[in-house]
Swiss-Prot record:
Misc note: Heme 1 (or BL or b562) is low-potential and absorbs at about 562 nm, and heme 2 (or BH or b566) is high-potential and absorbs at about 566 nm.
UniProt-recorded name of the protein: Cytochrome b
Cofactor list: heme b
Binding site for heme b b562: H83, H182
Protein species of origin: Calomys musculinus
UniProt subunit comment: The cytochrome bc1 complex contains 11 subunits: 3 respiratory subunits (MT-CYB, CYC1 and UQCRFS1), 2 core proteins (UQCRC1 and UQCRC2) and 6 low-molecular weight proteins (UQCRH/QCR6, UQCRB/QCR7, UQCRQ/QCR8, UQCR10/QCR9, UQCR11/QCR10 and a cleavage product of UQCRFS1). This cytochrome bc1 complex then forms a dimer.
SUPFAM superfamilies: a domain/subunit of cytochrome bc1 complex (Ubiquinol-cytochrome c reductase) (SSF81648), Transmembrane di-heme cytochromes (SSF81342)
Length: 380
């Protein structure tokens, strides 16, 4: 009798995706982050659902409702901090996942890569509208500053900003619609994830060697399910250490002050995972130029399949491009740090240099490095 999981219409899909999936036998722990992102998404949806049961999206009561969740709801403090710090864990896994894709040349699976970029943008949008919901000082001013950027769009900018605000300033209508967006976007992300997996399983996973692994594959279960469970346990351990011992270490103290439109904070500081894009935005003195640079800082990831001119896939056997890659990663850390600093010298200058370097490495230096490596290969 044939096993039910191979015949049943629904179980067959699960079987082909998570059990009998042919997987390269040499993929390392860097490939764990896809499953960790799936767990992060589940944690965020479950904790978010419980928070939504007690949260009120009204400017008069939003801040109080978050305080009520932490004080009066059973384990409300745990759910709230798991959701807030879960977002940080989500982005840590996301950045590593993208970084691994760049290092090992996974961007050559272009459909999977492009859906991944759409996922990245949607996740950043979800995090932004979610950050506004507690209605603290940084929530309010962050919403005001970031939505105001749309006014840089010629002709329709001002109308577009007022349309998003639902009035002439960030107010009750803005908070209500941001709550609606924050509720629906994770389900759109889930749909994107399924498409991401669909495209990935069409081609099969990449592997660290960059070679075709069709001749040497093993079933996903039990080998990689066990490996993923270890990763998940480590992720949850780090998350719970953050939640139980350092719940506010990644947050902003200003967000414990209720939103006040008459009092501007010393400087607008986004969450750490948005600092990178925010630093690039701030480094351009022109408003429209800044917004364009902000959008391009994410969309430039789509250029990787186009500018790849190397005869080798991935950076394992490419020392010059490898050096460029690690300079690029160091530069990302600098940009993340700069995004949280005041707008004054020397931070503005460091931000400008780092922003130029960010785009130059991707568009120019990596391309030049791969051409040099190709010539070295030819000469041997």
């Amino acid at each position: 009798m044939t096993i039910m999981r191979k015949n049943h219409p629904l179980l067959k899909i699960i079987n082909n995706s998570f059990i009998d999936l042919p997987t390269p036998c040499n993929i390392s722990s860097w490939w764990n982050f896809g499953s960790l992102l799936g767990i992060c998404l589940m944690v965020q949806i479950i904790t978010g659902l419980f928070l939504a049961m007690h949260y009120t999206s009204d400017t008069a009561t939003a801040f109080s409702s978050v305080a009520h969740i932490c004080r009066d709801v059973n384990y409300g403090w745990l759910i709230r901090y798991m959701h807030a710090n879960g977002a940080s864990m989500f982005f840590i896994c996301l950045f590593i996942h993208v970084g691994r894709g760049i290092y090992y040349g996974s961007y050559m699976l272009s459909e999977t890569w492009n859906i991944g970029i759409a996922l990245f943008l949607t996740t950043m949008a979800t995090a932004f509208v979610g950050y506004v919901l507690p209605w603290g000082q940084m929530s309010f001013w962050g919403a005001t500053v970031i939505t105001n950027l749309l006014s840089a769009i010629p002709y329709i900018g001002s109308t577009l900003v007022e349309w998003i605000w639902g009035g002439f300033s960030v107010d009750k209508a803005t908070l209500t619609r941001f709550f609606a967006f924050h509720f629906i976007l994770p389900f759109i992300i889930t749909a994107f994830v399924l498409v991401h997996l669909l495209f990935l399983h069409e081609t099969g996973s990449n592997n660290p060697s960059g070679l075709n692994s069709d001749s040497d594959k093993i079933p996903f279960h039990p080998y990689y399910t066990i490996k993923d469970i270890l990763g998940i346990l480590m992720l949850l351990m780090v998350l719970m250490i953050l939640v139980l011992f350092f719940p506010d270490v990644l947050g902003d103290p200003d967000n414990y002050t209720p939103a006040n439109p008459l009092n501007t904070p010393a400087h607008i500081k986004p969450e750490w995972y948005s600092s990178l894009a925010y630093a690039i935005l701030r480094s351009i003195p022109n408003k429209l130029g800044g917004v364009t640079a902000l959008i391009l800082s994410i969309l430039i990831l789509a250029m990787f399949p186009l500018i790849n001119s190397s005869k080798l896939l991935g950076l394992v056997y490419r020392p010059i491009t490898q050096a460029m890659y690690w300079i690029f990663i160091a530069n990302l850390f600098i940009l993340t740090w700069i995004g949280g600093q005041p707008v004054e010298y020397p931070f503005t200058m460091i931000g400008l240099i780092s922003s130029i370097l960010y785009f130059s490495i991707i568009v120019m230096f990596m391309f030049i490095a791969s051409m040099i490596e190709n010539n070295i290969l030819k000469s041997h």
